[in-house]
Amino acid sequence: MAARMNNQYEERLGTERMLPLIFKMALPAVAAQFVNLLYNIVDRIYIGHIPEIGTNALAGVGVTTSIVILISSFSAIVGAGGAPLAAMALGQGDRVRAGKFLGNGFMLLILFTVLTSLASYLFMEPILRFAGASAVTLPYAEDYLSVYLLGTLFVEISTGLNTFINSQGRPNIAMYSVLIGALLNIVLDPIFIFWFDMGVKGAALATILSQACSAWWVLGFLCSDRASLRLQKCYLKFDRRIVGGMLALGVSPFIMASTESLVGFVLNGSLEKFGDIYVGALAILQSAMQLVSVPLTGFAQGFVPVASYNYGHGDRQRVKDCFRIVLTVMFSFNFVLMLLMICFPTVVASAFTSDPELIATVEHVLPLFLAGMTIFGLQRACQNMFVALGQARISIFIALLRKVILLVPLALVLPRFCGVEGVFMAEAVSDATAAICCTLLFFWQFPKILRKMQNLIQN
């Protein structure tokens, strides 16, 4: 009986009307990610308002963002690389192969945790200095990161395996895992930061305790009879072909996430030369960008299983319908929110700090920084669709184009001609250029991908 109900959850990915199905799958993930975003923003707000040290503490924690992103990006190899392949396998009726993707993904997350935590502890100070920490902000950065690293495994599991819950058509269960961590974090933050007077260490402790609860929820579901795709002992053995497939497809989301870390190193390093006030401004701007990027990530988590399942099932029309809806929603949402932030920079800045100098700095650089992001929804839709369709090489190129090929060189060159404004302008130029290139590439390749799918089905 339970198996029949679980199969019904999967089958709806290939039978329900596309528009309500996508929103049914995506809205729980968007809601969960939005609450998670709220936690991140509230976290920064609390830190920024710590008496006497708020501005420097905010800059210090902002420096750690690059390292935190780099560590958590390894979960994208498993979550964004393994879950779509598991969904394709389910669409093809191959449950054993789908189970292997889940089991091997779990083992990879443990391996990534050991390697990243060890490296971060051994080289913490030089990494933080490279990321832009000054003599003033370094102590706050070290306080936060030293505690955060204790919970790396919880972060990897909760983010890396949650997408496997989505891939079996259970978005509500996946939503709860994020909500549990985010809401608990919002409650614990002021308790540890202010009541126990732990400062930034309290913020980090609240984070890892909350992520531990999320990880427990994810594992509890995946090991239970409620899951149609279960985490089983027989699949906890590395399979070279399974791991290779995950790495091939997951490299693109990993690069997309980890290059955010590389960019953080470069931007913070460039801004530190102009003063800690600009490093603090960047921390606020990155949080503002999350208002758009995090809900889009949630929407992607909802539609990717739908696209992957129907691609594996060979349903050309449903794949096309899925993309039309995704492109419209992602572009519209992204454009409207970015335009509002560009028009009202003072509101954005004042939410994070009461420092008049920092508010004035954010007002000046925010329009320069976010201008190119107005059309970034195009890239998010196209790139995530490439991932959903298993197009690893194209996804890798797109991920490299925006950050490594465009942004890093621009962030190093433009300040020589435009001063500190050049650092912020580099983001806008790279975002707009990459979005246009990605969209053109997708509309060139998409018909070829669909023809290849039809040929495979016919043969």
Describe each PLM feature range.
Residues 148-166, 177-182, 203-216, 297-300, ...:
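Short runs within selected transmembrane alpha-helices of multi-pass transporters and secretion channels
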Residues 1-26, 86-151, 195-251, 307-372, ...:
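Short alpha-helical transmembrane segments in multi-pass integral membrane proteins
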Residues 27, 43, 82, 123-124, ...:
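Hydrophobic/aromatic residues in alpha-helical transmembrane segments
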Residues 58-118, 155-174, 281-345, 376-395:
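Small-residue-rich hydrophobic transmembrane alpha-helices
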Residues 34, 38-59, 128-135, 191-198, ...:
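Helix-terminus/linker motif at the lipid-water interface of multi-pass membrane proteins
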Residues 32, 36, 40-47, 72-79, ...:
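Alpha-helical transmembrane segments and their lipid-water interface positions
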Residues 13-53, 66-81, 85, 110-117, ...:
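N-terminal transmembrane alpha-helices
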Residues 24-43, 147, 181, 210-214, ...:
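Transmembrane helical elements of multi-pass membrane transporters/channels
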